[in-house]
A protein has these predicted regions:
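Substrate-binding/active-site clefts of carbohydrate-active enzymes
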Residues: 2-13, 17-54, 60-172, 190-193, ...
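Loop/helix patches that line or flank the sugar-binding groove of alpha-linked glycan CAZymes
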Residues: 4-9, 28-32, 249-250, 258-410
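Hydrophobic faces of well-ordered beta-strands that scaffold small-molecule active sites
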Residues: 12-15, 55-57, 100-102, 177, ...
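Active-site beta-loop-alpha junctions enriched in small/polar residues
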Residues: 19, 60, 105-107, 182-184, ...
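A structural signal for short coil/turn segments at secondary-structure junctions
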Residues: 51, 172-173, 201, 295-296, ...
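Active-site-proximal helices and loops of the catalytic beta/alpha 8
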Residues: 91-96, 164-165, 180-260, 264, ...
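Short catalytic-loop micro-motif centered on adjacent basic/acidic residues
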Residues: 101, 176-182, 275-277
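Short active-site segment of divalent metal-dependent hydrolases/proteases
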Residues: 106, 178, 308
Length: 411
C-alpha cells in the first residue's frame, strides 16, 4: 500500500484555480504586483463551513498566461500578489485547520522561461540546452501547444531543479503537491525526485495527474502517493447522464482494486472538465456528490460545484474561462441560486467527516438496474452505510446506517 501520512486520513479538499477565482488578467503583461490573493483569503471560512480540511490550489507561480506556462518557479505570479500575500494566505489557511496543496507544473515550461531562452542561446549540446527536450534542432512541446516546452526529464540537472523547487515551497509551509501532467513524465523521474523531498519533509502528500493507464503500477513505479481517479469521474457523470448504473458499478469495482494499492484522489469536477451541473443538472450533481462522499479515497470539491455553477469546456482560445470563473468578493455577495446545493454539500461532507473510515471504504453492489443502484460501503469492523441511488423519476439519494436514514436528497 502506498504511503499516506496521518493528516491525509481526514483530507477533503476545496480545489481552486486562483487566476480565475480572483479575476486576474488573461496574460502577464507587466511585473507590477496586484494583491489579489486577499480575494481568495476572504473565502477560507467558506471552505471550512463547506466541510473541507484542505485548500488545493491551482498554479500560483509566475506564468505567461494560464498558470501552466511557468516563467519562474520561485516567484508568486504578480497577477496574484507577492511573497507576503502568499505567506498570509498560507498562515490564514493553517490557522483554520486547512492544509495547503500546490500545483507543480514540472513537465513543461513557458517558451519565455529563462530555461528555454538559455537553451536556445547555448545550443542543444550545451548544459543549458540539455535542460529541455529537442529533436533535430526543434524544441519538443507538450501535446501540440507551441508555447509549452517540454523539460528533459532524463537530465539529472532537471531532477535537481525540480527537487529544489519542491523543497523550497515545502520549507515555506506547503503541505502537499499535485503533479501536473504526471502521465507525460517517465515514472523513473519521480522515483528519483520524490525521495529527496520526503527525506526533508516526510509528511508531504504528493499525487499526480494521471488520466489513463494502470494507476497502481504508475503509483508503484513513480513513488507518488496517489493519482487522480479519472476512471471513476467518468463512471459517475456518465452513469447519471445515460441512466446506466452498470457503468458506475464497473467503475466502483475498479476503484476497489485501485484502493488496495493506494488511496485515490476522487472528484466530480476540476479546472479541465465541463461542470458536473452542466452535464447532469443540479439534482444530478448532488447525486454525484453523494457518491463522492460515500466511497473510499480522498475527495476534492472544485470551487463553484458546491454552488451548482455551470460551465462547458470548449476547444478554443479562452475556452477554459467558463469553467474557471471569477468568484464574488466574499460569500456575502452570493445569490441564493445555489443555496440548496450548498446545503447538500455541507451535509454530505459532514456525514463523511463523522465517518472518517470512509477514506478506506470498499463498496459492494446490493441491487443493480439501469436506473437504480444500491451499494454497501464500509470497512471491516464498522457498521456500513447503505447508499440507494435512483434516477427513474429525477435523481434521488437515500443513505442508511443500521437501518436508519442518515441522509436523504428529499430532506
Amino acid at each position: 500500500m502506498a504511503y499516506r501520512p496521518g493528516w491525509v486520513d481526514h483530507l477533503i479538499g476545496w480545489h481552486v484555480y486562483p487566476l480565475g477565482f480572483v479575476g486576474a488578467p488573461a496574460r502577464l503583461e507587466s511585473q507590477e504586483v496586484s494583491h489579489r490573493l486577499a480575494h481568495l483569503g476572504a473565502w477560507l471560512d467558506h471552505a471550512v463551513a463547506l466541510g473541507c480540511s484542505s485548500l488545493a490550489l491551482g498554479p500560483v507561480f509566475s506564468s505567461a498566461s494560464h498558470g501552466y506556462d511557468t516563467l519562474d518557479y520561485f516567484t508568486i505570479d504578480p497577477r496574484l500578489g507577492d511573497d507576503d500575500d502568499f505567506d498570509h494566505l498560507l498562515q490564514a489557511a493553517h490557522a483554520r485547520g486547512l492544509s495547503v496543496l500546490l500545483d507543480g507544473v514540472f513537465n513543461h515550461v513557458s517558451r519565455r522561461n529563462r530555461i528555454v531562452q538559455d537553451a536556445q542561446s547555448a545550443g542543444p549540446d550545451s548544459d543549458a540546452g540539455r535542460m529541455v527536450r529537442s529533436c533535430a534542432g526543434r524544441l519538443d512541446v507538450f501535446e501540440g501547444h507551441s508555447d509549452l516546452v517540454a523539460l528533459n526529464h532524463d537530465n539529472p540537472a532537471v531532477r535537481e531543479h525540480v527537487t529544489r523547487i519542491m523543497n523550497y515551497w515545502c520549507g515555506r509551509g506547503v503541505d502537499g503537491w499535485r503533479l501536473d501532467a504526471a502521465y507525460s513524465v517517465n515514472p523513473e523521474f519521480w522515483a528519483a525526485v520524490l525521495p529527496s523531498v520526503r527525506e526533508k519533509y516526510p509528511d508531504v502528500w504528493i499525487f499526480g495527474e494521471v488520466i489513463h493507464g494502470d494507476y497502481a503500477s504508475i503509483v508503484r513505479a513513480s513513488g507518488m502517493d496517489s493519482v487522480t481517479q479519472y476512471e471513476l469521474w467518468k463512471g459517475i457523470w456518465s452513469s447519471i447522464e445515460s441512466r446506466n448504473f452498470f457503468e458506475l458499478d464497473h467503475a466502483l469495482g475498479r476503484h476497489n482494486e485501485f484502493s488496495d494499492a493506494f488511496t485515490p484522489m476522487t472528484f466530480v469536477g476540476n479546472h479541465d472538465v465541463t461542470r458536473i451541473a452542466s452535464r447532469v443538472g443540479q439534482d444530478g450533481a448532488v447525486l454525484a456528490t453523494a457518491i463522492l462522499a460515500t466511497i473510499g479515497g480522498i475527495p476534492l470539491i472544485y470551487y463553484g460545484d458546491e454552488l451548482a455553477y455551470r460551465g462547458v469546456k470548449e476547444e478554443r482560445f479562452g475556452a477554459d474561462d467558463d469553467i474557471r470563473p471569477v468568484f464574488p468578493a466574499s460569500p456575502a455577495d452570493l445569490s441564493n441560486l445555489g443555496a440548496d446545493t450548498l446545503r447538500a454539500h455541507q451535509s454530505l461532507l459532514g456525514l463523511r467527516r463523522r465517518h472518517p473510515w470512509l477514506v478506506d471504504a470498499r463498496t459492494e453492489s446490493l441491487d443493480l438496474t439501469n436506473e437504480r443502484y444500491v451499494y454497501r460501503t464500509g470497512v471491516p469492523g464498522v457498521e456500513p452505510l447503505i447508499v440507494e441511488l435512483d434516477v427513474r423519476d429525477g435523481c434521488s439519494v437515500l443513505i442508511r446506517e443500521a437501518g436508519q436514514v442518515v441522509w436523504s436528497s428529499g430532506a
